[in-house]
Amino acid sequence: MLPPMALPSVSWMLLSCLILLCQVQGEETQKELPSPRISCPKGSKAYGSPCYALFLSPKSWMDADLACQKRPSGKLVSVLSGAEGSFVSSLVRSISNSYSYIWIGLHDPTQGSEPDGDGWEWSSTDVMNYFAWEKNPSTILNPGHCGSLSRSTGFLKWKDYNCDAKLPYVCKFKD
């Protein structure tokens, strides 16, 4: 058995070891977690890791894409899932409901020369494995070759549109 004078020093040593153990374990846990986005560019909103912003100054599709690229890690928005599409739709509806169409990063650089509308791609080069067409562009007589969201679908569905038209646009900022 320890003498009574040794108990406070043993207790102090034990407490010090426990504090150190907690700190070390906490550091390991923090390293395993992915770091969340700390902040979004001014005027944008986060959804998961990327941030999104609606710009109301109308531009052609090409000028809108360039405007997004001038911002850090920016591209016209690519909509990769129904959940992301719902977020973008709510962002657009919360800021403006006075426009019929909004540019997204979808375009057909082949100008319709691919069979069955297979030339469509995201300007961000994200893989296209989610589709939300209002109407399949390959079935349209005079299709545009740039993608937009249409108000008639609550900004949930994509519509091909004339690339030279001047529309508001949504940028997506990846970290």
From Swiss-Prot:
UniProt short sequence motif EPN, positions renumbered to this chain: 114-116
Tissue specificity remark: Predominantly expressed in pancreas, where it may be restricted to exocrine pancreas. Moderate expression levels in testis and weak in heart, kidney and placenta.
Free-text comment about domains: The EPN motif is essential for recognition of the peptidoglycan carbohydrate backbone and for efficient bacterial killing with Glu-114 playing a key role in peptidoglycan binding and bactericidal activity.
Sorted UniProt keywords: Acute phase, Antimicrobial, Cytoplasm, Disulfide bond, Inflammatory response, Lectin, Metal-binding, Secreted, Signal, Zinc
Keyword Metal-binding: yes
GO process annotations (BP): acute-phase response; antimicrobial humoral immune response mediated by antimicrobial peptide; defense response to Gram-positive bacterium; MyD88-dependent toll-like receptor signaling pathway; negative regulation of keratinocyte differentiation; positive regulation of cell population proliferation; positive regulation of keratinocyte proliferation; positive regulation of wound healing
Gene: REG3G
Name of the featured protein: Regenerating islet-derived protein 3-gamma
Record GO terms (molecular function): metal ion binding; oligosaccharide binding; peptidoglycan binding; signaling receptor activity
Compartments, as annotated in UniProt: Secreted; Cytoplasm
Paired cysteines (S-S): C40-C51, C68-C171, C146-C163
Region (Sufficient to activate EXTL3): 103-118
Pfam families, alphabetized: Lectin_C
Functional note: Bactericidal C-type lectin which acts exclusively against Gram-positive bacteria and mediates bacterial killing by binding to surface-exposed carbohydrate moieties of peptidoglycan. Restricts bacterial colonization of the intestinal epithelial surface and consequently limits activation of adaptive immune responses by the microbiota. Acts as a hormone in response to different stimuli like anti-inflammatory signals, such as IL17A, or gut microbiome. Is secreted by different cell types to activate its receptor EXTL3 and induce cell specific signaling pathways. Induced by IL17A in keratinocytes, regulates keratinocyte proliferation and differentiation after skin injury. In parallel, inhibits skin inflammation through the inhibition of inflammatory cytokines such as IL6 and TNF. Induced by IL22 in lung epithelial cells, inhibits cytokine production and regulates allergic airway inflammation.
Signal sequence interval, chain numbering: 1-26
Residue ranges listed under propeptide: 27-37
Description of post-translational modifications: Proteolytic processing by trypsin removes an inhibitory N-terminal propeptide and is essential for peptidoglycan binding and antibacterial activity.
Main location: secreted
Domain C-type lectin, chain residue ranges per copy: 47-172
Gene Ontology annotations for the cellular component aspect, listed alphabetically: cytoplasm; extracellular region; extracellular space
Residues at which Zn(2+) binds: H107, E121, H145
Top-rank taxon, per record: Eukaryota
SMART domains (UniProt xref): CLECT
PANTHER family in the cross-refs: MANNOSE, PHOSPHOLIPASE, LECTIN RECEPTOR RELATED
InterPro entries to which the protein is assigned, alphabetical: C-type_lectin-like (IPR001304), C-type_lectin-like/link_sf (IPR016186), C-type_lectin/snaclec_domain (IPR050111), C-type_lectin_CS (IPR018378), CTDL_fold (IPR016187)
